[in-house]
Amino acid sequence: MMIINLFITLTVIRGEHTMAEDNINGMNQIAQTERSAPTDFNFAIGTWTVKHRRLKDLLSETKEWIEFEGSSTTRTILGGFGNLEDNVLHFPNSSFRAAAIRSYDPNTKQWSIWWLDGRFPNKIDVPVVGEFKNKVGLFYAEDVLNNIPTKVRFTWDSTLPENPRWEQAFSTDNGITWQTNWSMSFLRAN
């Protein structure tokens, strides 16, 4: 190992460019990138109990709400530039798993969030994209639900980090009005 380090040092002193030097520089870039990872979702890291409130039919005019419990565990991935949220949802008639996958783009300074429902393992939702301001994150996407063009909005509110909240809302009139159809209240598990 000392001979390799000596070779790299002598090569660099002579001004020659080596693959080993590229590897060292690449590792330095990775380390620098990981040090500057975003902290927007740090509040979500850990294990939570979740209270859900959801419209029975998401695009319906009826306002019949269902309430149920769940749990969630979130951990960082991608050197802090992403996180993975593993959920268990206990609907009134059945339980299932789902995952939220989040990644941060340092060039746009925006997050993308994908939802994968365990009941439909071959379909991942269109990502919502957005950012946090003053501990509130707004994320948007355009999708087609029940053959209706629909704007989707996720809102993450971390102003109370010990009790963060998430909401989903849909708009079928191009964002003029929004109908909140699902909310989650998180409480850190013991």
Predicted regions and their residues:
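Initiator methionine at the very start of the polypeptide chain
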Residues: 1-2, 19
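Bacterial N-terminal signal peptides
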Residues: 2-11
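Hydrophobic small-molecule pocket/channel-lining residues, especially in calycin-type beta-barrels
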Residues: 17-190
